[in-house]
């Protein structure tokens, strides 16, 4: 098994910590909030308010299940438009009250079903991209598993984007890439090598800002490392003038 194939396998492993695991272990007094106030509450996106040390923050994540029943309830971590609208509602609330936003991302992509399209999946993702680019509080996004397509990017227009060591971040799945390029989804590993989807490759290209080393899926070291980096980075981001913060975020994505 090549290194890329191993990382792809580990990124998708059902045993990985979920967004709710990180929310409960890194933050204090996490309180989950529900619903987009327009259509429904999407279980594939979770979010709420919490404390990071003594700092109030908004935490949002894409939640995969740990077993079949849980995955069905979470739609296998593939958000509907109401999930993205819930996330945006929480981000705008964070902006109103001056709370930094931290997102945890693990998705193969946004749900492509007919109902999702009819309810405006593309519009929901596009609006998140637009609103996050100008959100007037610090944003940090962390890839904790798969970072697939616009479904991941809709929570990743951030001042800092981090990845765990054995995760992936790509414009589409390697299987989708192989199917489009070669009409053969079985060549996914070959596609992944061409796509440059690993944390090390993306860090080298400047797409992400930090790699979090992994020592097993459930590691107190990972949790403490993320918590420490979050405290330090949010302190630095909050110290910047708002105009500088927003300009740097804009320029960060313009260079792609």
UniProtKB/Swiss-Prot annotation:
Its EC number is 2.1.3.15. Residues 1-236 form the CoA carboxyltransferase C-terminal domain. GO terms for biological process: fatty acid biosynthetic process; malonyl-CoA biosynthetic process. Pathway: Lipid metabolism; malonyl-CoA biosynthesis; malonyl-CoA from acetyl-CoA: step 1/1. GO terms for cellular component: acetyl-CoA carboxylase complex. One of its GO terms (molecular function) is acetyl-CoA carboxylase activity. Its main location: cytoplasm. It catalyses: N(6)-carboxybiotinyl-L-lysyl-[protein] + acetyl-CoA = N(6)-biotinyl-L-lysyl-[protein] + malonyl-CoA. Keywords: ATP-binding, Cytoplasm, Fatty acid biosynthesis, Fatty acid metabolism, Lipid biosynthesis, Lipid metabolism, Nucleotide-binding, Transferase. The keyword Cytoplasm applies. It is found in: Cytoplasm. The keyword Lipid metabolism applies. Pfam families: ACCA. Acetyl-CoA carboxylase is a heterohexamer composed of biotin carboxyl carrier protein (AccB), biotin carboxylase (AccC) and two subunits each of ACCase subunit alpha (AccA) and ACCase subunit beta (AccD). HAMAP family: AcetylCoA_CT_alpha. Component of the acetyl coenzyme A carboxylase (ACC) complex. First, biotin carboxylase catalyzes the carboxylation of biotin on its carrier protein (BCCP) and then the CO(2) group is transferred by the carboxyltransferase to acetyl-CoA to form malonyl-CoA. Belongs to the AccA family. This is Acetyl-coenzyme A carboxylase carboxyl transferase subunit alpha. It comes from Streptococcus equi subsp. equi (strain 4047).
């Amino acid at each position: 098994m090549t290194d890329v194939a191993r990382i792809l396998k580990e990124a998708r492993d059902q045993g990985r910590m979920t967004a709710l695991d990180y929310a409960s272990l890194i933050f204090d007094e996490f309180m989950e909030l529900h619903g987009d106030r327009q259509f429904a509450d999407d279980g594939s996106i979770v979010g709420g308010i919490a404390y990071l040390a003594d700092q109030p923050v908004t935490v949002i994540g894409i939640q995969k299940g740990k077993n079949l029943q849980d995955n069905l309830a979470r739609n296998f971590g593939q958000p509907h438009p109401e999930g993205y609208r819930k996330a945006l509602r929480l981000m705008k609330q964070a902006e109103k009250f001056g709370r930094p936003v931290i997102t945890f991302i693990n998705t193969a992509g946004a749900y492509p079903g007919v109902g999702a399209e009819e309810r405006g999946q593309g519009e929901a993702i596009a609006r998140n991209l637009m609103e996050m680019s100008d959100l007037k509080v610090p944003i940090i996004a962390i890839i904790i598993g798969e970072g697939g397509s616009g479904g991941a990017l809709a929570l990743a227009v951030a001042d800092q984007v981090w990845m765990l060591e054995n995760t992936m971040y790509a414009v589409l799945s390697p299987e989708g890439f192989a199917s489009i390029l070669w009409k053969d989804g079985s060549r996914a590993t070959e596609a992944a090598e061409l796509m440059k989807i690993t944390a090390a490759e993306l860090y080298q290209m400047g797409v992400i800002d930090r790699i979090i080393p992994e020592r097993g899926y459930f590691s107190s070291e990972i949790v403490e490392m993320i918590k420490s980096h979050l405290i330090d980075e949010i302190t630095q981001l909050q110290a910047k003038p708002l105009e500088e913060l927003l300009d740097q975020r804009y320029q960060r994505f313009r260079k792609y």
